[in-house]
Amino acid sequence: MTASDLLTLPQLLAQYSSSAPQNKVFYTTSTKNSHSSFKGLESVATDATHLLNNQDPLNTIKDQLSKDILTTVFTDETTLVKSIHHLYSLPNKLPLVITVDLNLQDYSAIPALKDLSFPILISSDLQTAISNADSSYKIATSSLTPVFHFLNLEKIGTSTAIEQDIDFPTLEIANEETKVALSEATDSLTNFELVKGKESITTVIVNLSPYDAEFSSVLPSNVGLIKIRVYRPWNFSKFLEILPSSVTKIAVLQGVSKKSQSNEFQPFLLDFFGNFNELVSRNIEQVVLTNIGNVNDYGNVINTVISNINKKEPDNNLFLGESNEKAEEQAEVTQLISSVKKVVNLEDAYIKVLKQLFSSNLQILNQFSSETIEPSNPEFGFGRFLKQEAQREELISLAKTSLDPSLYLSEDANKIVQLLSKWLSFNGRDLDEAQLQEANATGLEIFQLLQSNQDSSTVLKFLKIAPTSDSFIFKSSWLIGSDAWSYDLGHSGIQQVLSSRKNINVLLIDSEPYDHRKQNQDRKKDVGLYAMNYYSAYVASVAVYASYTQLLTAIIEASKYNGPSIVLAYLPYNSENDTPLEVLKETKNAVESGYWPLYRFNPVYDDPSTDKEAFSLDSSVIRKQLQDFLDRENKLTLLTRKDPSLSRNLKQSAGDALTRKQEKRSKAAFDQLLEGLSGPPLHVYYASDGGNAANLAKRLAARASARGLKATVLSMDDIILEELPGEENVVFITSTAGQGEFPQDGKSFWEALKNDTDLDLASLNVAVFGLGDSEYWPRKEDKHYFNKPSQDLFKRLELLSAKALIPLGLGDDQDADGFQTAYSEWEPKLWEALGVSGAAVDDEPKPVTNEDIKRESNFLRGTISENLKDTSSGGVTHANEQLMKFHGIYTQDDRDIREIRKSQGLEPYYMFMARARLPGGKTTPQQWLALDHLSDTSGNGTLKLTTRATFQIHGVLKKNLKHTLRGMNAVLMDTLAAAGDVNRNVMVSALPTNAKVHQQIADMGKLISDHFLPKTTAYHEVWLEGPEEQDDDPSWPSIFENRKDGPRKKKTLVSGNALVDIEPIYGPTYLPRKFKFNIAVPPYNDVDVLSIDVGLVAIVNPETQIVEGYNVFVGGGMGTTHNNKKTYPRLGSCLGFVKTEDIIPPLEGIVIVQRDHGDRKDRKHARLKYTVDDMGVEGFKQKVEEYWGKKFEPERPFEFKSNIDYFGWIKDETGLNHFTAFIENGRVEDTPDLPQKTGIRKVAEYMLKTNSGHFRLTGNQHLVISNITDEHVAGIKSILKTYKLDNTDFSGLRLSSSSCVGLPTCGLAFAESERFLPDIITQLEDCLEEYGLRHDSIIMRMTGCPNGCSRPWLGELALVGKAPHTYNLMLGGGYLGQRLNKLYKANVKDEEIVDYIKPLFKRYALEREEGEHFGDFCIRVGIIKPTTEGKYFHEDVSEDAY
């Protein structure tokens, strides 16, 4: 094979590594984040395995070597020398090439391998490197012998293109019969080269340093130079052949990194003295070795070398030049330390848990320190522990013999003896946290008594052995194992710990990502199996980003266990620069796949007399190795009894994805057979994220069947590539994801098709239709993203010789009918090409719409009850998905693990989100505790405070869904109408400063919510009727039945004595789209009152503090579709003022007008804002007034001054206290840094105990602890401080930010939101401090899609997700929620966000006017133009935005 493109030297070496068909490539670096010194290697050897220098890489490689596979290793001399013990154990019969970069110029590493029997080639220039690369691979494959190739990349160069044709050989790996002898394979090599020198020279320099060319250019006429090209085999006869007979002195030069302190002969010099007799016969008088460091004056070095060798007694330990500690090496060390510190920050997720649980009782025996790296290894820490143990044993021994009061000349003698006896009883026991505290209090008291009673020899003996109180203290002792700074070579430290049976704990952190699992055979997770076989060790496998609760349990159990404990902790990262979010995603994939199972093994319970099991499985999937262990120990049956679903999970985890794929295809074929069709086959495959492509494919297949074709329809994920050529007629339909990417269920197929060069599709007829949006990426340079998957697929199929039935079809969302415009032309051409265009076809049923689903649902019942009982799937049908929204439930799946489950042949990990209806945003401590409990037992362990001041419980499995809703209703909190095409939760201002006004608007919120609550009895019937086995309390059904308000329990009696459901306001099809009310109280607009369908601005009499009425705004709404100019956000328009006592009828009129005039055909045009614009504000107002029978009064004046929450304590006019706690993005959870969920639970318990206070939720996703009397403020403050809820010292930007849920649970999200925004703000806070903006409030919003849940279009600064890792940056929103923003920059990548925002903040800091807000500033200085009205949202966007 000839190189057609110009390659650099590292790329050429990588190209050689693939010379044999079966090959493996490994390369090592100092950190995960750093690139190989063989620059460009990864671009050629794309499947190369990356290993770290400090993790014994040769041990990993050694286990993967095979005589049938050509293996190449790229490393450096330091890593190689450290692995020399592995090199000696390498078998001879291996095709292995180890290419070594002498990056420290330390050529002494080469003679260090002199006793190996393997060829060693040395390259000091480009041509030699090319020649030796060729030779090394030919020798390795022909003789089955490992070969070492040393070169100096810095000297030769890594970036210069090689401008010559290289014939890369295709090598066959020899076998025992065909292999040649090593001597034959190496015989033709040029071992030595006389670079310069005539027959008359008297001295020759043998150079083993990087300076061949430099030294040869300054040699005196009587001196020659020989360079070494092949060091092993050492062929001294070839050396003598080129050595001029006139030479009497040999100066050997060896490149080293620093001067040696040893005077011993160097190994390289011994090569010459090994042939001493031949030297004597050639009249060689002197052989002297000189070590060469970093050299600049080459002539001076040569003169010094020659002068030294001509002395009668030359210096045999001469070192010339400078130690080779270059700036680059210093930079590498600095980078290494920096990388390790970044890893330590990631590992803090575990270390903080230890510190929180054990605080002053924690002892970490080895910790990272950049100054003293060596003592951080586990062996050192264990040695330190053993020393402490020996001292403790001596102390115990003395205490046991000192229990006689007469030994103490003190009145405290009896007390000392009693305490010593008690202290002794604590030794050798399992101590829980309380016992640990008691034991340490006892030890401290003993030491204090001994110090104050030093009148006896016994006391002096104690103080000699135990000079400090620490000697009496009981610690939870931990060793930390880290891939970055505390690597346990061969797990020797673990073996010592287990063998010792000492009471010590090991936290072993594994950083290997799931997708690298095949690269490393020596996995830490397997240490768990090894440790469990000891039967005397506690073992746990944990993952902080998978199950925080399980981690806490394991750490506590490990510390309590009296013996060795091994806690395997997962923290996967691909780079030291990875964020916690990236670690979280990797963790979820590994746990879900079963690669990293969560479990605990406690030998204390490995006893038939106990009713507990020694092994506890905390995740649902385990792999074969762990299963085999359990089978062998006969514990699997116990596990299965405890968790009946386990056996099914085990079977799933062991299944083969290909088998499942074939089963699915077989079913499709069987269905086709049952139809008894006689026409030609048509296989329809789709790739779809949002469902459009899938629905279109299913519709096409149905139409094909109606025309007599044998049609099947499957996801592209179900294609078996090898069977594709025989499928005759195939249609591919794909939507477009991200930046022109295939949807999730098409990626695997596309990668396989793209990389298969042998596939012949000449017998296949194909058609392709794509769904895209030509304006989604508006920039000219991004236009190629439009329908890129379908276009790429069509070209690839043609390249593989497939025959196109019809031209490629490209659907465009910008067309009048969306993708249907192009599809309606494309489909008839397909029928014509297949010869069925004239077939008689019955009228096709119209597609089922949401309006159909509502109409046929029997007042929101559908088949929800039946679906809940169906255990064959974790999800529900599409129709029930839509109906369950009316019940406050959204179907979700964990998108972080969607791909890994797909690869296993499993359906998405379906789960549900339950949203509470909470008018007024007010909740009791009983309700909070119930939600907290439900989130732990049925949800994902967190609570979400939403941007509409209510709760969401995420991660509820279908089997727990009814229990969750019943648990909420048991505390009089329902979910009816929390979503769906009805009025949803009514949000009101939190208003902690004014109790009287807040009570009025809270009452109004409840009145509106109750008035517009659906009157169907379906909710009660489906979720609440009768008792359930899962009920926590038998009284639940009676609570449901006796509740006076909430969901209706009985149907309405109509004529004919029939009991039916009636919806007097909504009717049987409810509203065209969702509908919301907000209530604001000037000067506070913390609910963004103009952003919603109906906004009520309370007009308060300043003297009486009575709400006299409301200004009514209609037509607000945030939802849009990217680049679809028919959709836009809109602020509400004022219809006028209405008195408080008259408010319900006009509100009902607004709902009725929307019900009757809203667009029920196009859901993207169905919100009230479009109805108002279509009818005109005045036209809409007239319709409402017609229904109401009255006129709106003129709008009353008001002024907003604030849009944010105010944090900390405040007292209202009644004397009650309120504390607003900062809950970032509304996610209430326990983390190592912020145990907020536990803290708020403690607050709720305190409220319940003292009968004081309640909670309020704010529209900015924060929490107000309300109505606390003065006597209980101190108690609440203590709890807040303990659980870090009292911290409000955040930047103004962070305090003013909010975010939607986004990935991974929201099905609409294109990009990260809640999990990413805190990281962005953290990156910005340094510059805020620098610019003097730390305390300035800037409204920042972030969403994963354009639907607007966090009201991003009102943000002064907003990021709206457009594709994975891609956002639109919006600027210019009004600080008071009074103005929409506008697009500033489209398609901003994750890593670009901060770079775009920083200059804006800097300019704002320098040029703003007094009191000017950021959004106003952006408009005043012309950074962005104002959005004057929603319908003009897409206008006046700068061309630079795209």
Curated annotation (Swiss-Prot):
Pfam families: Flavodoxin_1, NIR_SIR, NIR_SIR_ferr
Pathway noted in the entry: Sulfur metabolism; hydrogen sulfide biosynthesis; hydrogen sulfide from sulfite (NADPH route): step 1/1
One GO BP: sulfur amino acid biosynthetic process
Cofactor entry: siroheme; [4Fe-4S] cluster
Top-level EC class: oxidoreductase
Protein keywords: 4Fe-4S, Cytoplasm, Heme, Iron, Iron-sulfur, Metal-binding, NADP, Oxidoreductase, Phosphoprotein
Lineage: superkingdom: Eukaryota
Cofactor note: Binds 1 siroheme per subunit. Binds 1 [4Fe-4S] cluster per subunit.
ATP-binding keyword on record: no
Matching InterPro entries: Flavdoxin-like (IPR001094), Flavodoxin/NO_synth (IPR008254), Flavoprotein-like_sf (IPR029039), NiRdtase/SiRdtase_haem-b_fer (IPR005117), Nit/Sulf_reduc_fer-like_dom_sf (IPR036136), NO2/SO3_Rdtase_4Fe4S_dom (IPR006067), NO2/SO3_Rdtase_4Fe4S_prot (IPR045169), NO2/SO3_Rdtase_4Fe4S_sf (IPR045854)
Residues with Phosphoserine modification: 903
Disulphide bond pairs: none
Catalyzed reactions per annotation: hydrogen sulfide + 3 NADP(+) + 3 H2O = sulfite + 3 NADPH + 4 H(+)
Domain Flavodoxin-like: 682-831
Family: Belongs to the nitrite and sulfite reductase 4Fe-4S domain family.
Designated name of the protein: Sulfite reductase [NADPH] subunit beta
Organism lineage string: Eukaryota, Fungi, Dikarya, Ascomycota, Saccharomycotina
Gene: MET5
